[in-house]
C-alpha cells in the first residue's frame, strides 16, 4: 500500500511539533488555532470542543480540532491549569503575500510556571522554581515571570528543597541535574509538580550578578535559560537575582503553615478563615501579594520588626490621614504586572492609561505620608518616585477614552503629533466636503432625492433611483447598476475619497507607530516602576495591619532576650473573628525563663488546640511586624516554629498517621534550637496506647534535656503529668471544666496543674452516640481506671534498665530475647533518615522488609 502523501502545510506542522513533543501545539491557520493528531484528540476531550478530521476521505484521516484565535486564551488557561504546556505557532507573514506555505514559528511556550496573560487574572504570585545539585548541596531559585521577582538560595538536603517548593506553592519545577527516581516520584506524585529539564545556563551578568554563590548562580542561570527558551524574547522586567537564606526568616514547614491556617483554611482550601483573610485590608494587588509574603516569611531580625511596628503606630495615631491614604491607594493599579506586560510587548492603551492614573496618585500618597511628619516614614518617602516625566508622557500621548486594541485607531491624543493631526483634519473636513458636494449636485441636477452613500465595494457614490436617471449630469460616471437604482461617481468625489482613504490609512499606521514608540519609552522606566511598586506595596500592607489592629483591639508586642513568654489575656485572632469578641474566652500564656515545656491536658473539644495555635499565631503576627490580639504581649524572637497538629492529615500519599507524626516529630527534634517554638498536639495517638505513651514521654524528656525549645505538648496520656516531678523545666496546665448535676461544661480556660479526667464519654455524648453505648463505655472506663500506670523518671529507667512505663497489665513478649544479629540491621543503621523524605524512608523500609 502506497504511503499517503503529506501536504506541505502538514509537513510544516510535523516539523514544528517534533521540537515540542511535551506541549500542545496551537497552529495558527487564519482565524483559528488548529490542533492535529494526538493533540487534537486529547484537547477535544479536555476542552469539550468538536473533534473533526483533515482529509476525511483518506484511509487515515488526520484528527483535527480548533479554537478561534480571539478566544484562545480561555482554552489555553484550561490546559495550563491542568498542568500542560502549550506552544503557540503564529503566522509570521501575511498569507496574501506568502509564496507557497505561510511561514510559521513558535513564538511562546506557556507553562504552569510561566503564565503571564490569563483570562482570569489572579493577584497572587505564580512562582517557577529551579533546582540544582553539586555534591550533597542543593541550589534553589525561583521567579515570578509576571512580576519579575527573582531569588536564589542553597539548601542542605532534598527534604528542605521539597519544603521550600511547597511553601512557594509552585506548580512547575525546572530540574538542572540527574534526579533520582525516588526523588522524582516525590516531586511528581506527592507534590503534584510538572517537571521540566534544563541543563544549560543563560549567562547574564546583569541578572545573575556576583552576590550569589557558585551553586546559586548555576541554578539561577538554568532558570533564566528555561524562561528565555519558553518566552523567546528579552524580558526587561526581570529583576536581579537576590540571595536569601531560610534562616533569615521564621522557619516553618508547609505542614506547619497549613495547620495554622496562615494563608488559607486547611479544611476548605479557601482564603476565608485564614490569617491572611483576617489581616487583608490592602487596597492594591501588590500590597496583597506582599502581605502574603510577610505572613509566609516572618522576620527574625528584631530591628526590622520594630521598624514595621513604628510605621503601624504612626498610622494608628493618625486616623483621618490614614483613611485618606487608603482611599488614594484604591486608585493604584498593579504596577508590577503592568510593567511585565510592557516588557512582553503586550501592553495595550488601557494598560498605559492605568499606569498613568497610578502615577498621578503617587504625589497624593506622598503628600499624605509627609503630613504625618514622622521620621519612621523617611525611608518609604524616598522610595516613592512619582516619575513625573513618564506620567506627563502618558497623559499627553494616550487618549483617556482609547480602546484596548492597538489597531483600531483612537489611541493618540489630539495635539501630540502634528502629522497625525493633519491626517485627522483631512478625515474630518472630508466629511463636510462630501456634504457640500452632495448639496451642490442636488441643486445643479434638480434630483431632489440625490444623496451620497458609502460601502466598502464601491466607496463613496451618488445614489440615483431609476425614475431620475434622465436627470443625471454628463460628468457622472456609472459605478454599479441595481434593480431600482444606479450608483454614480464624479471626478471631484473620487478625489475627495482618495484623500480621505489615504489619510485614514496613513493615520492608522502612524498612530500604531506612535503607540509603539511610547511603549518603548515606558519600557525604559521599568526598574524605577518596580521600585515604586515595592514602596507602594509596603505602605499598603502597613496601613492594612494598622486597620486590623485598630478594628480588633490588638496591642503592640515587645521583645525580650530572657527567653520569656508573657501574653496577658491573649486570643486566637481568627477564631475570635469568626466567633465574635463576646463569645471568645481569652487565655493568658506564661513561660518564665526557666520554663520550657507546658504539658497540656484536658477534654477533647475543650480548646487545647486553639490555645496552642493561639501562641503560634501570636508569634507569627508579632514577627511579621503586626500587632497581636491580647492585653499585652512580651515574647522572645523565635527562629522557627515546629508543629504536629493532625487535624489536616492527608493520607493519600500512603503515609499512616503514626508515620506522619514521627516524621514531623523528627524534624522538630533534629532541627529545633533553644530559640524555637514546638507545638505537639496529641503526639503518639497513631499507635498502640503504651507505645504512644512511651514515645511521648521519651520525646518530652529529649526536648527537655537536649533541645531546650519552648514547647506546648497536649496529650490525652494523663499519666505523663507525673513528669513534672522529675523535669524541672516542665509545668502542667489543663483546661478547666465545671461539673454540676451530672453535666459537664468546658470553660475553655487554661489553668495551672494537671487535669483529673478526660471526659471522653461526655464528648461522645455531645456527638450524639446512643445512650446504651455510652452506658457500656462508662462501665468499661470504671474497670480500666482500677488498673495502675506509674510514670518513672528517666534516671530510674537508666539505672534499673526497666521501661519508662511500668504497668500491671499483660506485658508484651520481648522482641530482643535470644537475639541473633541480622545483616539487614546494619543496612538499617546505615540509612541516613535525617536527609531522606518520608517517601524515601518508606521505600527503603519496604526494600529491607523484602530481605527479612
UniProtKB/Swiss-Prot annotation:
Spell out the molecular function terms from Gene Ontology. Answer: ATP binding; ATP-dependent DNA damage sensor activity; damaged DNA binding; mismatched DNA binding
Q: Which UniProt keywords apply?
A: ATP-binding, DNA damage, DNA repair, DNA-binding, Nucleotide-binding
Per UniProt, ATP binds at 602-609
Gene3D superfamilies listed in its UniProt record: 1.10.1420.10, DNA repair protein MutS, domain I (3.40.1170.10), MutS, connector domain (3.30.420.110), P-loop containing nucleotide triphosphate hydrolases (3.40.50.300)
Q: Which domain of life is it from?
A: Bacteria
Q: Does the keyword DNA damage apply?
A: yes
Family matches, as InterPro entries: DNA_mismatch_repair_MutS (IPR005748), DNA_mismatch_repair_MutS-lik_N (IPR007695), DNA_mismatch_repair_MutS/MSH (IPR017261), DNA_mismatch_repair_MutS_C (IPR000432), DNA_mismatch_repair_MutS_clamp (IPR007861), DNA_mismatch_repair_MutS_core (IPR007696), DNA_mismatch_repair_MutS_N (IPR016151), DNA_mismatch_repair_MutS_sf (IPR036187)
Keyword DNA repair appears in the UniProt entry: yes
Cellular component terms (Gene Ontology):
cytosol
Output the CDD domains linked to this UniProt entry.
ABC_MutS1
Query: Which Pfam family is one of this chain's hits?
Result: MutS_I
Its Gene Ontology biological processes? mismatch repair
User: What job does this protein perform?
Assistant: This protein is involved in the repair of mismatches in DNA. It is possible that it carries out the mismatch recognition step. This protein has a weak ATPase activity.
Protein family: Belongs to the DNA mismatch repair MutS family.
> Under which name does UniProt file this protein?
DNA mismatch repair protein MutS
Question: What organism is recorded for this protein?
Answer: Streptococcus thermophilus (strain CNRZ 1066)
Amino acid at each position: 500500500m502506497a504511503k499517503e502523501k503529506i501536504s506541505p502545510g502538514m509537513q510544516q506542522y510535523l516539523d514544528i511539533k517534533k521540537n515540542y513533543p511535551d506541549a500542545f501545539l496551537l497552529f495558527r491557520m487564519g482565524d483559528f488555532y488548529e490542533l492535529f493528531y494526538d493533540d487534537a484528540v486529547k484537547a477535544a476531550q479536555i476542552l469539550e470542543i468538536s473533534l473533526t478530521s483533515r482529509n476525511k476521505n483518506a484511509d487515515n484521516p488526520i484528527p483535527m480540532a480548533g479554537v478561534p484565535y480571539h478566544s484562545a486564551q480561555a482554552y489555553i488557561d484550561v490546559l495550563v491549569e491542568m498542568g500542560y504546556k502549550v506552544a503557540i505557532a503564529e503566522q509570521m507573514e501575511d498569507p496574501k503575500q506568502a509564496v507557497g506555505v505561510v511561514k510559521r514559528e513558535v513564538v511562546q511556550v506557556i507553562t504552569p510556571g510561566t503564565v503571564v496573560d490569563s483570562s482570569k487574572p489572579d493577584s497572587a504570585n505564580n512562582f517557577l522554581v529551579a533546582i540544582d545539585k553539586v555534591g550533597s548541596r542543593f541550589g534553589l531559585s525561583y521567579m515570578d515571570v509576571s512580576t519579575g521577582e527573582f531569588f536564589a538560595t542553597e539548601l542542605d538536603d532534598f527534604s528542605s528543597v521539597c519544603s521550600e517548593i511547597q511553601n512557594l506553592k509552585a506548580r512547575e519545577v525546572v530540574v538542572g541535574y540527574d534526579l533520582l527516581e525516588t526523588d522524582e516520584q516525590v516531586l511528581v506524585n506527592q507534590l503534584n509538580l510538572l517537571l521540566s529539564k534544563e541543563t544549560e545556563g543563560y549567562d547574564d551578568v546583569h541578572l545573575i550578578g556576583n552576590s550569589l554563590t557558585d551553586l546559586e548562580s548555576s541554578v539561577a542561570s538554568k532558570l533564566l535559560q528555561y524562561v528565555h527558551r519558553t518566552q523567546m524574547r528579552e524580558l526587561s522586567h526581570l529583576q536581579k537575582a537576590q540571595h536569601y537564606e531560610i534562616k533569615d526568616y521564621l522557619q516553618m514547614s508547609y505542614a506547619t503553615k497549613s495547620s495554622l491556617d496562615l494563608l488559607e483554611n486547611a479544611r476548605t482550601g479557601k482564603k476565608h478563615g485564614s490569617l491572611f483573610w483576617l489581616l487583608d485590608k490592602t487596597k492594591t494587588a501588590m500590597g496583597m501579594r506582599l502581605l502574603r509574603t510577610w505572613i509566609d516569611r516572618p522576620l527574625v531580625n528584631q530591628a526590622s520588626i520594630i521598624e514595621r511596628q513604628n510605621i503601624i503606630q504612626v498610622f494608628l495615631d493618625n486616623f483621618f490621614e490614614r483613611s485618606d491614604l487608603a482611599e488614594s491607594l484604591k486608585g493604584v493599579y498593579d504596577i508590577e504586572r503592568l510593567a511585565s506586560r510592557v516588557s512582553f510587548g503586550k501592553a495595550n492603551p488601557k494598560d498605559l492609561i492605568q499606569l498613568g492614573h497610578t502615577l498621578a496618585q503617587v504625589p497624593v500618597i506622598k503628600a499624605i505620608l509627609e503630613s504625618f511628619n514622622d521620621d519612621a516614614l523617611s525611608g518609604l518617602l524616598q522610595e516613592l518616585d512619582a516619575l513625573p516625566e513618564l506620567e506627563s508622557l502618558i497623559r499627553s500621548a494616550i487618549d483617556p477614552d482609547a480602546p484596548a486594541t492597538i489597531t483600531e485607531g483612537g489611541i493618540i491624543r489630539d495635539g501630540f503629533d502634528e502629522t497625525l493631526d493633519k491626517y485627522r483634519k483631512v478625515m474630518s473636513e472630508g466629511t463636510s466636503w462630501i456634504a457640500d458636494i452632495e448639496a451642490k449636485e442636488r441643486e445643479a441636477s434638480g434630483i431632489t432625492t440625490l444623496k451620497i452613500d458609502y460601502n466598502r465595494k464601491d466607496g463613496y457614490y451618488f445614489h440615483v433611483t431609476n425614475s431620475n436617471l434622465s436627470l443625471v449630469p454628463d460628468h457622472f460616471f456609472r459605478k454599479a447598476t441595481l434593480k431600482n437604482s444606479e450608483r454614480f461617481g464624479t471626478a471631484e468625489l473620487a478625489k475627495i475619497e482618495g484623500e480621505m482613504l489615504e489619510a485614514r490609512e496613513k493615520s492608522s499606521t502612524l498612530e500604531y507607530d506612535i503607540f509603539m514608540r511610547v511603549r518603548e519609552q515606558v519600557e525604559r522606566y521599568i526598574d524605577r516602576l518596580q521600585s515604586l511598586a515595592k514602596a507602594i506595596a509596603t505602605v499598603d500592607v502597613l496601613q492594612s495591619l494598622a486597620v486590623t489592629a485598630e478594628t480588633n483591639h490588638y496591642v503592640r508586642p515587645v521583645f525580650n532576650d530572657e527567653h520569656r513568654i508573657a501574653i496577658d489575656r491573649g486570643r486566637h485572632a481568627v477564631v475570635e473573628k469568626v466567633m465574635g469578641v463576646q463569645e471568645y474566652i481569652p487565655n493568658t500564656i506564661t513561660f518564665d525563663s526557666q520554663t520550657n515545656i507546658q504539658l497540656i491536658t484536658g477534654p477533647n473539644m475543650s480548646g487545647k488546640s486553639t490555645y496552642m495555635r493561639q501562641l503560634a499565631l501570636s508569634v507569627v503576627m508579632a514577627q511579621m511586624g503586626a500587632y497581636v490580639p491580647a492585653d499585652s504581649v512580651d515574647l522572645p524572637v523565635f527562629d522557627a516554629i515546629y508543629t504536629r497538629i493532625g487535624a489536616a492529615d492527608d493520607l493519600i500519599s500512603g503515609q499512616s498517621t503514626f508515620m506522619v507524626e514521627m516524621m514531623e516529630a523528627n524534624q522538630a527534634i533534629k532541627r529545633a534550637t533553644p530559640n524555637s517554638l514546638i507545638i505537639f498536639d496529641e503526639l503518639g495517638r497513631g499507635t498502640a496506647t503504651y507505645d504512644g505513651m512511651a514515645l511521648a514521654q521519651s520525646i518530652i524528656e529529649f526536648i527537655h534535656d537536649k533541645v531546650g525549645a519552648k514547647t506546648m505538648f497536649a496529650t490525652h496520656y494523663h499519666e505523663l503529668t507525673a513528669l513534672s516531678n522529675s523535669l524541672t523545666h516542665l509545668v502542667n496546665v489543663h483546661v478547666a471544666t465545671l461539673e454540676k448535676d451530672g453535666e459537664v461544661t468546658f470553660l475553655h480556660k487554661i489553668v495551672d496543674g494537671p487535669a483529673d479526667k478526660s471526659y471522653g464519654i461526655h464528648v461522645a455524648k455531645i456527638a450524639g452516640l446512643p445512650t446504651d453505648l455510652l452506658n457500656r463505655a462508662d462501665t468499661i472506663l470504671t474497670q480500666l481506671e482500677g488498673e495502675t500506670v506509674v510514670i518513672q523518671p528517666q534516671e530510674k529507667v537508666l539505672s534499673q534498665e526497666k521501661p519508662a512505663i511500668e504497668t500491671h497489665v499483660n506485658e508484651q513478649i520481648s522482641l530482643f530475647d535470644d537475639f541473633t544479629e541480622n545483616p539487614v540491621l546494619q543496612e538499617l543503621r546505615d540509612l541516613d533518615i535525617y536527609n531522606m523524605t518520608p517517601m524515601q524512608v518508606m521505600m527503603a523500609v519496604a526494600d529491607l522488609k523484602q530481605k527479612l
